[in-house]
């Protein structure tokens, strides 16, 4: 029983260390995509239509 609790703690700590990493990576990809899109197709606020 003690070994299974140790494994559960190990897996839980791996999950806690992986979730923030995945969150930072996914947010970085999303904002990078947004920035590149706005670089290629600028916002109409700075380039208004005539």
Curated annotation (Swiss-Prot):
Assigned GO CC terms: photosystem I; plasma membrane-derived thylakoid membrane
Q: Provide the alphabetized UniProt keywords.
A: Membrane, Thylakoid, Transmembrane, Transmembrane helix
One Pfam short name: PSI_PsaJ
Q: Where are the transmembrane segments?
A: 21-41
| GO BP annotations, alphabetical order | photosynthesis
SUPFAM superfamilies linked to this entry: Subunit IX of photosystem I reaction centre, PsaJ (SSF81544)
Task: Give the signal peptide, or none.
Answer: none
What is the first-listed, main subcellular location in coarse terms? membrane
Membrane keyword on record: yes
In which domain of life is the source organism classified?
Answer: Bacteria
Q: Does the keyword Cell division apply?
A: no
What is the membrane topology noted in the UniProt record heading this document?
Single-pass membrane protein
Which compartments is it annotated to reside in? Cellular thylakoid membrane
Name the family the entry cites.
Belongs to the PsaJ family.
This protein is called PsaJ-like protein asl3190
Which organism does this sequence originate in? Nostoc sp. (strain PCC 7120 / SAG 25.82 / UTEX 2576)
